[in-house]
UniProtKB/Swiss-Prot annotation:
Belongs to the 2Fe2S plant-type ferredoxin family. SUPFAM superfamilies: 2Fe-2S ferredoxin-like. GO terms for biological process: electron transport chain. One of its GO terms (molecular function) is electron transfer activity. It is found in: Plastid, Chloroplast. GO terms for cellular component: chloroplast. It comes from Arabidopsis thaliana (Mouse-ear cress). Keywords: 2Fe-2S, Chloroplast, Electron transport, Iron, Iron-sulfur, Metal-binding, Plastid, Transit peptide, Transport. This is Probable ferredoxin-4, chloroplastic. [2Fe-2S] cluster binds at C91, C96, C99, C129. Ferredoxins are iron-sulfur proteins that transfer electrons in a wide variety of metabolic reactions. Pfam families: Fer2. Expressed in leaves. Not detected in roots.
């Protein structure tokens, strides 16, 4: 095996057929883009960006309030579990309605879901297993029975 040094890492290339350094660099760039969503042409290669934290207040049917931290990369259900809270769920993919809550303030992205109808979304219903908080939010939990 030959070793080729690019910037600060070494790539081992089998000597089955000779690959020019420019071909190896292109292959590495394509693999990084394909497998990891990375691209040095974006100018952010190798940088890590922290997502802005959102406060999500969860209100149980009994009126108990819990505030958790969330961000737009982690659904409300997962953020609640990370904080040690238990919320109802089943599918974790936005297809069953078990985790339904009602958003009374704030904004979420739940574009990955397929269970709720547009009318239900307009009334504020969300699926906590897919809802990503885009702003600070207040959510009433355990609202599956409202959908029936």
């Amino acid at each position: 095996m030959d070793q080729v040094l690019y910037s600060s890492y070494i790539i081992k290339i089998p000597v089955i057929s000779r690959i020019s350094p420019s071909q190896a660099q292109l292959t590495t760039r394509l693999n990084n883009t394909t497998y990891f969503g990375l691209s040095s042409s974006r100018g952010n290669f190798g940088k890590v960006f922290a997502k802005e934290s959102r406060k999500v207040k969860l209100i149980s049917p009994e009126g108990e309030e819990q505030e958790i931290e969330g961000n737009e990369d982690c659904c409300i259900l997962e953020s609640a579990e990370n904080a040690g809270l238990e919320l109802p769920y089943s599918c974790r993919s936005g297809t069953c309605g078990t985790c339904c809550g009602k958003l009374v303030s704030g904004k979420v992205d739940q574009s990955l879901g397929s269970f709720l109808e547009e009318e239900q979304i307009q009334k504020g219903y969300i699926l906590t297993c897919i809802a990503l908080p885009l702003e600070d939010c207040v959510v009433y939990t355990h609202k599956q029975s409202d959908l029936i």
